[in-house]
């Protein structure tokens, strides 16, 4: 594991793969991080979360217990995963909730998916392989493989196509040809 700065970071009981890179001011505990994953500053990853290999988790993101990111997942800045759809401070008797009162739901983000900055991913969701969640989206239900979803709530926009080789997409990005002219 390589780090830029451990100052004011809490890293406890974490299983790290090879060549993991962590930037400062993180809170990681009881989770697993796969090989060659990059974790930005001000990220929290809770116990029981599993992060695959070659993932990128951008700054200020929150990954809670019960979340699994498969290999090659991108998480933009300020993404929040939720593992309880009906959170309450107190139980039915008015006492502060304990672990026994809490019902955690799991979330799975499959290989190669990308989640745009500022998105919120509710619990009990599966985001399919190579799916793209647009920035600022609120994902309330499963996202199919290769789907592009956006909005609040997130809705299907279209599907990613495999007709264009990846190299051609990167070439268009370098030249700026992917941008529409301003009207």
Feature roles, as predicted:
Residues 168, 172, 176, 180-181:
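Short, low-complexity intrinsically disordered segments enriched in A/P/G/S/L with frequent Arg
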Residues 1, 180-183:
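Short, basic, low-complexity termini and linkers enriched in Ser/Thr/Gly/Pro
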Residues 1-15, 22-125, 153, 160-161, ...:
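Flexible, glycine/small-residue-enriched loop-and-beta-strand segment within the central core
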Residues 149, 157:
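Hydrophobic residues at beta-strand termini and immediately following loops
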Residues 125-148:
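C-terminal/domain-terminus segments
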């Amino acid at each position: 594991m390589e780090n830029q700065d451990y100052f004011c970071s809490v890293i406890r009981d974490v299983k790290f793969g090879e060549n993991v890179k962590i930037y400062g001011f993180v809170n990681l505990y009881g989770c697993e991080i796969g090989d060659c994953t990059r974790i930005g500053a001000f990220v929290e990853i809770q116990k029981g979360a599993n992060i695959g290999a070659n993932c990128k988790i951008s700054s200020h993101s929150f990954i809670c217990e019960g979340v699994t990111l498969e290999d090659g997942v991108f998480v933009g800045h300020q993404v929040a995963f939720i593992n309880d759809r009906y959170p309450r401070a107190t139980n039915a008797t008015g006492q502060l909730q304990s672990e026994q009162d809490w019902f955690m739901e799991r979330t799975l983000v499959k290989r190669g998916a990308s989640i745009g900055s500022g998105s919120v991913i509710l619990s009990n969701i599966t985001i399919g392989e190579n799916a793209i969640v647009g920035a600022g989206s609120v994902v309330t239900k499963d996202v199919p493989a290769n789907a592009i979803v956006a909005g609040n709530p997130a809705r299907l926009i279209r599907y990613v196509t495999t007709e264009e080789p990846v190299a051609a997409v990167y070439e268009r990005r370098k030249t700026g040809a992917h941008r529409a002219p301003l009207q």
